[in-house]
């Protein structure tokens, strides 16, 4: 039978385990890597490029996150692909961000500067999306789009948007989204769209935020490309048609 003294020590030990997680999360670089992995799995080179960090530094941070079981890894040939351990890790990141937003005035300043929506405006926009009343543009890299996106969204990575904006129909309002409220890609996409004469707004929620709200998310192997509007030709290579016997 376990002694009362040992029971007490074991009860206190859980704080050490919590601190283990907290220590790993107490790094802006590791939080950045974790947020990127919430968008989809990546290898070290891809993560380093997306995070603006060196491969060596990113690898060290990922090893610490792996030791705390926040991320998992599997080998793909010569590369190692990382992903979040499970959805509870993504949820914990969202809760941490929500806590910071509720108690730190600096977060409110950042949100305003990045164009955060008011709650009522956000809900109205989500309702219009659910009713398929808008054209959705996913401004993230195509790999993130494949990992999960809003149903019906068109994959138009921000760096491709200026050359492909003509593919978007003009009949409806366009809503662009990216990685979440602290990602500037969607607001930049709206600037490009408005400059081209479109009615456009941004949604300040990313796919992990939408999943947390039980908004349907779909996956696809290939990005959906819009049909070119009248007067323009698609720059994509046409598929070979199968001959009908």
What are these regions (language model features)?
Residues 2-6, 18-23, 36-38, 46, ...:
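Rhodanese-like catalytic fold shared by cysteine-dependent sulfurtransferases
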Residues 28-31, 39-43:
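Short capping segments at the starts of secondary-structure elements
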Residues 37-40, 50-52:
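Core residues of bacterial helix-turn-helix
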Residues 54-57:
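Helix-turn-helix DNA-binding motif, specifically the short coil turn and the N-cap/start of the second
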Residues 62-63, 207:
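Short, hydrophobic-biased segments on the C-terminal half of alpha helices
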Residues 66-76, 83:
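Beta-hairpin "wing" of winged helix-turn-helix
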Residues 133-140, 156:
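Short hydrophobic beta-strand that contains or immediately precedes a catalytic carboxylate
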């Amino acid at each position: 039978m376990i002694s009362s003294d040992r029971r007490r020590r074991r009860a206190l030990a859980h704080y050490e385990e919590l601190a283990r997680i907290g220590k790993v999360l107490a790094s802006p670089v590791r939080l950045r890597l974790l947020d990127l992995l919430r968008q989809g799995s990546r290898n070290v080179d891809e993560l380093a490029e997306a995070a603006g960090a060196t491969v060596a530094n990113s690898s060290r941070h990922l090893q610490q996150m792996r030791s705390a079981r926040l991320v998992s890894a599997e080998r793909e040939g010569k590369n190692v692909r990382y992903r979040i351990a499970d959805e509870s890790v993504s949820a914990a990141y969202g809760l941490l961000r929500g806590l910071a937003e509720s108690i730190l005035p600096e977060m409110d300043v950042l949100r305003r500067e990045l164009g955060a929506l008011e709650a009522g405006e956000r809900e109205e926009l989500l309702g219009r999306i659910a009713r398929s009343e808008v054209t959705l543009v996913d401004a993230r890299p195509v790999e993130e789009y494949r990992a999960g996106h809003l149903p019906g969204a068109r994959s138009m990575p921000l760096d491709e948007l200026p050359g492909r904006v003509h593919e978007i129909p003009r009949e409806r309002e366009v809503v662009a989204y990216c990685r979440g409220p602290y990602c500037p890609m969607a607001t930049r996409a709206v600037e490009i769209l408005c400059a081209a004469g479109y009615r456009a707004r941004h949604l300040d929620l990313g796919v992990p935020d939408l999943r947390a709200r039980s908004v349907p998310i779909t996956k696809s192997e290939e990005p959906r490309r819009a049909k070119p509007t009248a007067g323009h030709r698609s720059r994509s290579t046409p598929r070979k048609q199968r001959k009908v016997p």
